[in-house]
Amino acid sequence: MASPRELTQNPLKKIWMPYSNGRPALHACQRGVCMTNCPTLIVMVGLPARGKTYISKKLTRYLNWIGVPTREFNVGQYRRNMVKTYKSFEFFLPDNEEGLKIRKQCALAALRDVRRFLSEEGGHVAVFDATNTTRERRATIFNFGEQNGYKTFFVESICVDPEVIAANIVQVKLGSPDYVNRDSDEATEDFMRRIECYENSYESLDEDLDRDLSYIKIMDVGQSYVVNRVADHIQSRIVYYLMNIHVTPRSIYLCRHGESELNLKGRIGGDPGLSPRGREFAKSLAQFISDQNIKDLKVWTSQMKRTIQTAEALGVPYEQWKVLNEIDAGVCEEMTYEEIQDNYPLEFALRDQDKYRYRYPKGESYEDLVQRLEPVIMELERQENVLVICHQAVMRCLLAYFLDKAAEQLPYLKCPLHTVLKLTPVAYGCKVESIFLNVAAVNTHRDRPQNVDISRPPEEALVTVPAHQ
């Protein structure tokens, strides 16, 4: 039996790992968050205008945000790339042999790219977005998954509410490249005929015939669900997420606390109170929220003094969330960037090299913070109008989820003090309005410096530090 290897601590993530010949061994899992022992293929099912692409995009965004490398493969886009000009619904008629041939080629091309992503490029989850309305087509895709060692999970969206279908056609399909420069009524008529092309051959997932498959059926945008044979942790998280999202129009308001006493001094973390300008912002925020006349607004804060002081000025009930507390800077709490450079120059450089994954000694990383904030995202997806009064790093993580920003971009998103971001979910994304409330505040945003080498001179390490007292 081999003797246990010596351990060393990874300087970036502060994770203990074996080492040999004076160098750390490769970590057991190098592909982001390992939640499954094999890749997962998510297969969308449903007629056109049932929200499949909406679900695909949201699911892809969520999984990437929690650290699971995920990519969406929209077969409609493959078809548009192959057939540059869309003429009419006749392309989708079941007896259109040329159309059938092209659509099959597009599906196969998408599956080849799925295989490349999951088997060669280190992907964990692929979302195959197409109608997949026949049992024969789904069997072909399932066999493809089995042959390549993937777990297959079907997501079917069923909608019989005419109002929801009509709204989906107007919001999404008429903005499709297929209908650019087409009359609205003409486009609607054509799209309705396109749906008819699929209806006669549509075979929904069946509790008896498909009892061996893993799937979730979503009825009328979340009115009810059927879940069958959830196979692993990643599938259970997918189900949990899909059971929390809704399409009710709403807005989410994100802002930081008012300027704090430590903000003025350029010190990070701590639990300070508001500065005079911070208290002024809290009053302005109260007026802004009152002027917006938001129906059934919920207000959330962290459990830190500065967010609670900000919320108190609103004069409305609010809920404190410990998970909304600012990132824990560990041994660097309440230090200025200059003091961190003086006392921990190696740590300061390592953080600049990979700000998302870097973990403060005895503290947290942005990666840790994202995992901590997942319950907040789930609850935000369930709620309607919410104001979240939080902190710079926390706001960056929440904003990255809604705007689909990569991990490398997340720690550098600009979230200035005394500014409210109004996020309004739209068809395939999120509309953002930035509202500055006309109360001056210090700048706390530090860009990544050009020189991130551990041997850099102090002046190059500190070149992007914002001015402070």
From Swiss-Prot:
Active-site residues annotated for this sequence: D129, C159, H257, E326
Catalysed conversion reaction: beta-D-fructose 2,6-bisphosphate + H2O = beta-D-fructose 6-phosphate + phosphate; beta-D-fructose 6-phosphate + ATP = beta-D-fructose 2,6-bisphosphate + ADP + H(+)
Binding site for beta-D-fructose 6-phosphate: R79, R103, T131, R137, K173, R194, Y198
Keywords: ATP-binding, Hydrolase, Kinase, Multifunctional enzyme, Nucleotide-binding, Phosphoprotein, Transferase
Residue ranges, annotated region (Fructose-2,6-bisphosphatase): 250-469
Job of this protein: Synthesis and degradation of fructose 2,6-bisphosphate.
Entry protein name: 6-phosphofructo-2-kinase/fructose-2,6-bisphosphatase 4
Species, as recorded: Macaca fascicularis
